[in-house]
Amino acid sequence: MAHAPEPDPAACDLGDERPKWDNKAQYLLSCTGFAVGLGNIWRFPYLCQTYGGGAFLIPYVIALVFEGIPIFHVELAIGQRLRKGSVGVWTAISPYLSGVGLGCVTLSFLISLYYNTIVAWVLWYLLNSFQHPLPWSSCPPDLNRTGFVEECQGSSAVSYFWYRQTLNITADINDSGSIQWWLLICLAASWAVVYMCVIRGIETTGKVIYFTALFPYLVLTIFLIRGLTLPGATKGLIYLFTPNMHILQNPRVWLDAATQIFFSLSLAFGGHIAFASYNSPRNDCQKDAVVIALVNRMTSLYASIAVFSVLGFKATNDYEHCLDRNILSLINDFDFPEQSISRDDYPAVLMHLNATWPKRVAQLPLKACLLEDFLDKSASGPGLAFVVFTETDLHMPGAPVWAMLFFGMLFTLGLSTMFGTVEAVITPLLDVGVLPRWVPKEALTGLVCLVCFLSATCFTLQSGNYWLEIFDNFAASPNLLMLAFLEVVGVVYVYGMKRFCDDIAWMTGRRPSPYWRLTWRVVSPLLLTIFVAYIILLFWKPLRYKAWNPKYELFPSRQEKLYPGWARAACVLLSLLPVLWVPVAALAQLLTRRRRTWRDRDARPDTDMRPDTDTRPDTDMRPDTDMR
């Protein structure tokens, strides 16, 4: 086996200057906590349920094996070898690729704005869980105290608390509304907690991560044990994992599987590059990539089982309530004795009455009661946490305790992800020396958190939820795929496969297998090209959003509306802003080198008019010894 050349001693000595993790456990927990986030709890179970249950695992595993793990390995390897943040890493590989690092920093900044807003929402619900009864358990009375608020009666108590008492949402994105002070306070508190945890980088996050990364697994286990003992839990699990293979013909399934991999592993954020830069240069990054990716996958499955065992109970409970209301209508209209119709007898009785009294039965307010319909009502994203799961808690004994556990788990999950997201912004800024050396890191961290907080106040407006959906749909998904594509291409085709494999051999003691080389060189770039092309095609369709409008004729269903022109422009800008750094930085580098070449040419004697041909960037993947 060929061995990579030994690096300069000065490069190795850099490890004494750069901060290091106290132990391997801190690093693995930080990477796992950064990767395992809110999406593992509410997006992955929803995708499994939407796309054919167990059938969704097929594209998910394929995307994980041929796209997720290889790119994850690339990020850990370049961060560990160069011992810099994303900007420093890509500048070292090629100055023309410095825009990739700037794009990662910009993307992490944008994601941190709306992600910590969700953490603020979670904090608001967590604080409201310390009361009995829970504030979303019943509708508030109207002004006359003669009934309940009409909007709440037309929807549900949990929906009213979410859309009106929490978000106080407007009916249209054009109506910005005012800042909601309770959300602003929770947002400030969330950023204050993040600042205190990342104030000194890995020195402080390495201590907090023991709790924030492990506590969610404890709560998931508690919910799983409790959920499996509830009636209807097995129905939820059967519905979740029953495969529908025909759904694999839908290209959207494969796109969602690919994007879920990027969200669940937090790829292309730059956070893993930053975390890996604090490792020992001889750390086995290949093993870390595989272990963390598999832990992340098992966490998603584990969370799906826990979530849908509880949602199966809710669906069964709603289904039985629907049957009971229909049975009561039949008993009252046909003067049957009380309890004369059981739930098991209801279908036969209804069929008999339809045959003998069809007109009379047609006039009754009977609803179609199908268990599958209630299982289909599970929601994705914040709706799962703030509407579906809060309603489920109400049916469980000791509802406030379960609410506190659930939102406490979400809060710690969100914090763990925020640690990596903020570190992806701060580490490159420290590496490039944005502030003078005498300015402490605590000041830069505080400045970044303050700017993020002020920028995120737009999400505390009454229209803030619409803006959050725009950021989530257009700032995150397309840029993650495009930046990941540039990462793979930059390492394999700009830096060079052989040189990269030599570096990995020096770090891990073994050269990458054909699996790694094939995925890096062909499979991952090809898959990413297809996914990016498909996303571009989706952008040609009219852009729509769903509004909460109590005056909508189909209320409580959300009204689908077209984005206004200015909002569409914002969508396009957000989808291009991070990746625009790539051509801009490359052009700036080209102009800088051209000016330098012209200046050198003017300074030479007239007899030597030959330009300097050695203008290639120094892409030796050795750390810069002139670093803090």
Curated annotation (Swiss-Prot):
Record function comment: Does not show neutral amino acid transporter activity.
UniProt entry tagged with the keyword Acetylation: no
Tissue expression as described in the entry: Abundantly expressed in kidney, but not in intestine.
CDD domains documented for this protein: SLC6sbd_B0AT3
Record GO biological process: amino acid transport; neurotransmitter transport; neutral amino acid transport; renal amino acid absorption; sodium ion transmembrane transport
Glycan attachment positions: 144, 168, 174, 354
GO molecular function (one): amino acid transmembrane transporter activity
PANTHER family: INACTIVE SODIUM-DEPENDENT NEUTRAL AMINO ACID TRANSPORTER B(0)AT3 (PTHR11616:SF109), SODIUM/CHLORIDE DEPENDENT TRANSPORTER (PTHR11616)
Sequence similarity: Belongs to the sodium:neurotransmitter symporter (SNF) (TC 2.A.22) family. SLC6A18 subfamily.
Species of the source: Homo sapiens
InterPro entries (alphabetical): B0AT3_SLC6sbd, Na/ntran_symport, Neutral_aa_SLC6, SNS_sf
Protein name: Inactive sodium-dependent neutral amino acid transporter B(0)AT3
Keyword set, alphabetical order: Amino-acid transport, Glycoprotein, Membrane, Neurotransmitter transport, Symport, Transmembrane, Transmembrane helix, Transport
Known disease link: Genetic variations in SLC6A18 might contribute to the disease phentotype in some individuals with iminoglycinuria or hyperglycinuria, that carry variants in SLC36A2, SLC6A19 or SLC6A20.
NCBIfam families, alphabetized: Na_transp
Chain's gene name: SLC6A18
Chain ranges on the Extracellular side, renumbered to this chain: 48-51, 112-178, 231-253, 312-399, 466-474, 541-568
